């Protein structure tokens, strides 16, 4: 009887193991100390995770991420970026346009950004969530309907930090999910390579943010 019970549970076991395998993070790209992972989640578009260590303080990183107008200098294929509304020193709404490869239409993103910090661990969280209905869409751009981006930044020393980055996105438009997933790790990798250079600029290295403890 015991073997029969075990036999009955085999399909359940393999189903559970298969689900876990599908949800496991898979390393897709590694370059210059940057690791980019992806996994299949509940949505049709892959989730993305990035990991890197950067020679920068929390303040340097926060200053760069709050400097929305400069996103065009490092964020992959961003062609325009500006603040829509500054709510406080650590919170704002912003707008960006993103160039995509032909024949796909270019995208635009409307988003809310908020920075928080754990008072005990000092880990800084930068959370950006799309707000697609905040302003009217334009007919020549596809409005990204959903984007959820999180930076978890942990201080390692007075001059070095570890970044763990998470992204879930639905880019909108008619492109099939399999095609989007095929190239989903390229944008974060290219962005982080430029980010490592951008964050070393004097205006970030010399910055002071009162609500961040390094």
Q: Predicted segments — roles?
A:
Residues 22-214:
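Eukaryotic helix-grip
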Residues 17-21:
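Sec/Tat signal peptide C-region and signal peptidase I cleavage site
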Residues 1-6:
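Positively charged n-region of N-terminal signal peptides that target proteins for export
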Residues 7-15:
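Bacterial N-terminal signal peptides
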């Amino acid at each position: 009887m015991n073997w029969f019970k075990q036999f009955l549970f085999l399909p359940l076991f393999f189903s559970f193991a298969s689900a876990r395998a599908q949800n496991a993070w898979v390393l897709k790209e590694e370059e210059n100390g940057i690791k980019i992972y992806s996994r299949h989640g509940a949505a049709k578009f892959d989730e993305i995770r990035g990991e890197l260590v950067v020679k920068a303080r929390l303040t340097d990183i926060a200053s760069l991420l709050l400097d929305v107008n400069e996103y065009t200098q490092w964020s992959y294929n961003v062609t325009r970026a500006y603040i829509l509304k500054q709510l406080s020193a650590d919170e704002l709404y912003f707008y960006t346009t993103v160039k995509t490869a032909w024949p796909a239409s270019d995208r635009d993103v409307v988003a809310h950004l908020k920075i928080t910090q754990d008072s005990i661990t000092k880990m800084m969280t930068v959370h950006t969530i799309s707000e697609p209905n905040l302003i009217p869409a334009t007919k020549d751009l596809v409005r990204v309907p959903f984007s959820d981006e999180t930076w978890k930044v942990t201080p390692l020393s007075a001059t070095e930090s570890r970044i763990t980055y998470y992204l879930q996105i639905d880019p909108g438009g008619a492109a099939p999910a399999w095609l989007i997933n095929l190239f989903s790790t390229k944008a974060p990798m290219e962005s982080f390579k430029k980010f490592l250079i951008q964050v070393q600029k004097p205006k970030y290295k010399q910055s002071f943010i009162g609500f961040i403890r390094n």
